Amino acid sequence: MEIYCELIRKRYAEIASGDLGYIPDALGCVLKVLNEVATDNSLSESIREKAAYAAANLLVSDYVNE
């Protein structure tokens, strides 16, 4: 957990404590957010490319949208 930024650790603690809701389809959630980042023209091309690459790698992995 120490390798993640403070904001991620904070959200993790909030989910674990029940203050924030847990999303069972975590991969679907990640893919949705990565898609939003990749299509956000207000962000740098570098960030958008990183998001697109990460999403594509998830899609190539064992992820199956049921």
From Swiss-Prot:
Pfam family membership, one: UPF0253
Entry similarity comment: Belongs to the UPF0253 family.
HAMAP family: UPF0253
NCBIfam families cross-referenced by the UniProt entry: PRK04964.1
Protein name: UPF0253 protein Ent638_0728
